[in-house]
């Protein structure tokens, strides 16, 4: 990273090459996905005695509801390592202050927050009209296996969220606020807006950049029925 940062100021340096910048960021993303999966599996197996691949997130497995609390924090760690850390690696490689590179120090007018809230609220009625109906959704002949895979992914996600929200205790509520709301919001903001949007903006027009980033953002959630609502929001 120091070597890359040291050459960033040159006319042909890394900072002046959006493609090199994109490759570094995506390499960090893929690398941290692997590191995250290996690390959380090791932590999980050490804490529970079995591999996380055998864990049923909905708690339906024998004696597995007792591990929901651990699973909650494992999810938070995975999100942080998968999105926030790659963003910081990219920002460090770009050179200069990584916090400034990720727009931590950018001043935003209070009116911009208000405008954003109004825009999102106004879009909700439209978003509801493009939500896929899971019950009536069919891909047609020849695509039954893909349809089955999509439904299984949706059911798994629903079961996981349901299990995480079942515990109504104060500690579980606070944990969910951190793991389900705060960590994803910050980590994904750093990766998609701090790294991806910033980098793609150097390759294409701003409007196209926003659409491409939104597409990738929604795709990486691997929830097909909510793909278009998430992308438009």
What is each model feature region?
Residues 1-113, 117-122, 128:
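N-terminal, membrane-interfacial amphipathic/helix-forming hydrophobic leader that caps
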Residues 2-21, 38-41, 129-155, 220-233:
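Alpha-helical transmembrane segments of multi-pass integral membrane proteins
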Residues 8, 67-70, 96-101, 161-167, ...:
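Short, functional N-terminal and low-complexity linear motifs
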Residues 52-58, 100-183:
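Juxtamembrane helix-loop-helix connectors linking adjacent transmembrane helices
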Residues 61-64, 75-77, 105-108, 156-157, ...:
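Short amphipathic alpha-helical segments, especially helix-boundary/capping motifs
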Residues 91-92, 132, 198, 202:
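Transmembrane helix-loop junction
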Residues 123-126, 163-233:
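Transmembrane helix-loop-helix hairpins at the membrane interface
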């Amino acid at each position: 990273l120091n070597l890359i940062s040291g050459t960033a100021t040159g006319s042909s340096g890394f900072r002046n090459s959006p493609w090199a910048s994109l490759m570094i960021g995506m390499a960090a993303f893929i690398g941290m996905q692997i590191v995250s999966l290996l690390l959380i599996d090791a932590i999980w197996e050490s804490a529970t005695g079995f591999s996380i691949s055998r864990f049923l997130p909905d708690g339906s497995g024998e004696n597995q509801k007792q591990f929901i609390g651990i699973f909650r924090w494992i999810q938070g760690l995975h999100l942080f390592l998968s999105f926030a850390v790659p963003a910081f690696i990219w920002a460090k490689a770009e050179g200069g202050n990584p916090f400034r590179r990720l727009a931590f120090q950018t001043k935003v007018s209070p009116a911009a927050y208000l405008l954003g809230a109004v825009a999102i609220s106004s879009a909700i009625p439209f978003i509801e009209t493009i939500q896929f109906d899971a019950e009536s959704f069919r891909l047609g002949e020849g695509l039954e296996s893909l349809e089955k895979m999509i439904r299984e992914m949706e059911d798994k996600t629903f079961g996981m969220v349901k299990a995480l929200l079942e515990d109504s205790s104060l500690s579980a509520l606070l944990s969910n606020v951190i793991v389900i709301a705060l960590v994803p919001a910050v980590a994904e903001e750093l990766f998609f807006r701090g790294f991806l949007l910033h980098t793609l903006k150097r390759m294409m027009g701003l409007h196209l950049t926003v659409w491409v980033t939104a597409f990738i953002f929604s795709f990486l959630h691997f929830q097909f029925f909510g793909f278009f609502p998430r992308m438009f929001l």
